[in-house]
A protein has these predicted regions:
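N-terminal secretory signal peptides that target proteins for export/translocation
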Residues: 1-13
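Primary mode marks residue(s) on the alpha4-beta5-alpha5 output face of response regulator receiver
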Residues: 37-69, 76-187
Length: 187
């Protein structure tokens, strides 16, 4: 009897919220058209110096993320967000993004971003742009040998401005972003 790998299990668990995210993706399609094309554009984005990546690293994968930032009310403020998102590329859905922060590809690779990230607020109505150092990239595929991850061109995703109704109240706030994954170049 064949057993499921952790990647297969994660993708199965994702199926519960995937339809919602696909709906969000369709709504975000017009916003995505104004941004770089993930399928063909592996140029590094123009970013503030606080989140720039050194020149000895090059973009090897660029995906468009659509999902939610999940906040929980602790009685006095909204707690740190946990993402649930999918990443799109020319071939369609290529990866999922979840707590860690972790990205897991259909090709079998996984990368976790080191916390805390370098962050800069570009749009006061959206979650910050980030640069994360990659830790523990695993498996063959698009996230293999990743050194840095950037989240840029963000829309939405900010914690609600109103207080939660009760301790434990959960708010799922839609967001979109471009994600750039870097590898070190050999010189």
């Amino acid at each position: 009897m064949k057993t499921k790998t952790s990647l297969q299990i994660q993708w199965i668990q994702t199926s519960a919220w995937l339809p919602t995210l696909v709906g969000l993706a369709l709504g975000a399609a017009s916003a995505a058209s104004a941004l770089a094309e993930p399928a063909t554009d592996n140029r590094a984005p123009e970013v503030p110096t606080e989140i720039a990546v050194s020149n000895d690293n090059k973009v090897h994968f660029h995906g468009f993320g659509v999902g939610v930032q999940i906040y929980t009310w602790n009685g006095s403020s909204w707690g740190t967000a946990v993402p649930e998102a999918i990443l799109f590329h020319a071939e369609g859905v290529v990866a999922i993004h979840f707590a860690g922060p972790t990205w897991q590809s259909k090709s079998g690779s996984t990368v976790v971003g080191a916390l805390p990230p370098k962050a800069v607020t570009v749009d006061p109505n959206a979650i910050p742009w980030l640069r994360l150092d990659a830790k523990s990239p695993e498996g063959p595929g698009i996230f293999a040998n990743t050194t840095f991850i950037q989240r840029v061109n963000t829309t939405g995703g900010k914690a609600p401005s109103a207080d939660g109704a009760f301790v434990g109240h959960v708010a799922r706030v839609p967001y979109t972003a471009d994600y750039f994954f870097y590898r070190q170049t050999s010189n």
